[in-house]
Swiss-Prot record:
This is Putative NADH dehydrogenase/NAD(P)H nitroreductase CCNA_00059. Its cofactor is FMN. Belongs to the nitroreductase family. HadB/RutE subfamily. The keyword Oxidoreductase applies. Keywords: Flavoprotein, FMN, NAD, NADP, Oxidoreductase. Its EC number is 1.-.-.-. The keyword Zinc does not apply. It comes from Caulobacter vibrioides (strain NA1000 / CB15N). Transmembrane segments: none annotated.
Length: 195
């Protein structure tokens, strides 16, 4: 595997920003499908792929989500062409016969409901990270948010399912509106150890 060039690394990481302001031009469904097609290949435990992606694009759906968000997140949701609810499906073990066929009993690994939920939350968070990097790879900006009422979002969007919300992320073409100066990051020695 070859190292990516500096321009690509800049687009994905070092020059990318979390956006608050958005060009409201809609994103074609084909772009949303292409983004999922990239995201789904990111690794998860036992290939379980517990994340579920609800693409909120209509004015009606945006209003439903915005009213359940905190502070300034509502206007961001209304302005962005798409905000994605990244959830995790507690029924994910039922898909393991398809996704992990070489281990026929894999779904029985998740009989403990607490362990199952932790696995789903952890791996949907991984998938959410892949999703944001995938969006940047396709030339989109992202704006992740966790300021919303999870229980209310679950009731509003996931009623009748075993899906729970993890976080939300707006995607599209960002503007400089509300873009803060880049904040510092922890240095290697503050965040890492080589053992």
């Amino acid at each position: 595997m070859a190292k990516l060039d500096d321009a690509t690394l800049a687009q994905l990481f070092t020059e990318a920003r979390s956006h608050n302001g958005w060009n409201p031009e809609p994103l074609p469904e084909s772009v949303l499908r292409e983004l999922y097609a990239l995201t789904k290949f990111g690794p998860t435990a036992a290939n379980g792929s517990p994340a579920r992606f609800y693409f909120v694009t209509s004015a009606e759906a945006k209003e439903r989500l915005a009213k359940l968000s905190s502070g300034s997140n509502g206007p961001k949701i209304m302005q962005a062409p798409c905000t994605v609810i990244i959830g995790y499906d507690l029924d994910f073990p039922q898909t393991l016969p398809k996704l992990f066929p070489h281990a026929p009993g894999a779904k029985d690994w998740f009989n403990d409901p607490v362990a199952k939920e932790w696995c789903a939350l952890r791996n949907s968070s991984l998938q959410g990270g892949y999703f944001m990097i995938g969006a940047r790879a396709l030339g989109l900006d992202v704006g992740p948010m966790s300021g919303f009422d999870n229980a209310a979002v679950d009731a509003e969007f996931f009623a009748g399912t075993n899906i729970k919300s993890n976080f939300i992320v707006s995607i599209g073409h960002g503007t400089d509106e509300g873009l803060f100066p880049r904040n510092p990051r922890l240095d290697f020695d503050e965040a890492a150890k080589i053992l």
